Amino acid sequence: VITPASREGASRVRRECTASYVGDGFWLTAHHCVSQNPSMDGYLEQFDGQRAGIAGIYTLSDTDDVALIEVGPGIDADTFEVAQDPLDIGQQATLTGYGETHDYASSATTTIVAHRDEIDFGSAVYTDLFEALSATASRSCSGDSGAPVYIGSTIYAIHTGGGYNPSCVDGKDMLMWHTNIAPRATWIKSTIRMNAGLTESEESKAAAGLGAAPLDEPVSSDVDQGSNRPLTVS
C-alpha cells in the first residue's frame, strides 16, 4: 500500500501482507489485507526483487478472509495448486510469510487442532477457519497475513491471524488461525477463469501501481527454499 508521506506528494512503502501465486496472473491473499482499500494502487514484490503492479482485486464476501489480486507482467513464479479437501485435525503443514519487520521469508510448522465455524476478530468476523498451534518456536507475526499454509505445492489455507506479535518473537504452541481454502476453491477457480487477461484499464492501473515502487534496485534476500514462494503486498 502506498501512502502519502508529505504534502509534497512523496510516498513511502508499507509492507502489509503476503500473497501466493495461483495462476494466470492471480495471487491469493487475505480479505482483511485489501478490504480497507479494494481499489488500491500498489504492487507485489517477490523475494528476488521482481515486481508487478496491481491490476484488480476480487473478494468473496466480508466474512470470507480470502482475496485474489490480479497483476500485470513482471514476476515469474511457480503455481500453487488449490486444495479441494481440507486439512485434518492433527495434520501439520508449513506456513511461510514475510514478517512486517523482515526483508525475507520465514517458515513455521503449524499443527491443526480444531475447526472454527466463526471467529470475531473485533474488526471483522470471519468464517470456516482452522485453529492451529506452532509446532516449534517459529510462529506467525505481523506481515504474515495472507501467507500460504501448504503441503508440497498444494495450498490448503491462508493465514488470517495469531497472537499479537509485532516484533516477530518466537514461541512454541502459540495460537494461529488459518482460513480454510477447500470450500472457497470453486470461487477461486471461477474468478480466475472469468477474469483472466487484462483490459486496457487494468493494464493502466497495473502500470500506475508499479510506478509507485521505489526507484532504487531491490536487494535479493535469503528466503526459505521451495518451488513456490509467497511475496509481499505493498
Question: Where is each model-derived feature located?
Answer:
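Short, small/polar residue-rich loop motifs at catalytic or cofactor-binding pockets
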Residues: 13-16, 141-145
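Short conserved beta-strand and strand-loop elements enriched in small hydrophobics
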Residues: 1-3, 38-50, 91-98
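C-terminal subregion of chymotrypsin/trypsin-like serine protease catalytic domains
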Residues: 21-27, 145-232
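Extracellular/periplasmic catalytic domains that process cell-envelope and extracellular macromolecules
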Residues: 11-13, 21-22, 59-63, 85-89, ...
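Acidic glycine-/aspartate-rich tracts in secreted/extracellular proteins
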Residues: 32-36, 72-76, 99-102, 154-155, ...
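Chymotrypsin/trypsin-fold serine protease catalytic domain
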Residues: 63-137, 173-189
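Catalytic-histidine neighborhood of serine endopeptidases
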Residues: 14-16, 22-64
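N-terminal activation segment of mature serine protease catalytic domains
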Residues: 1-14
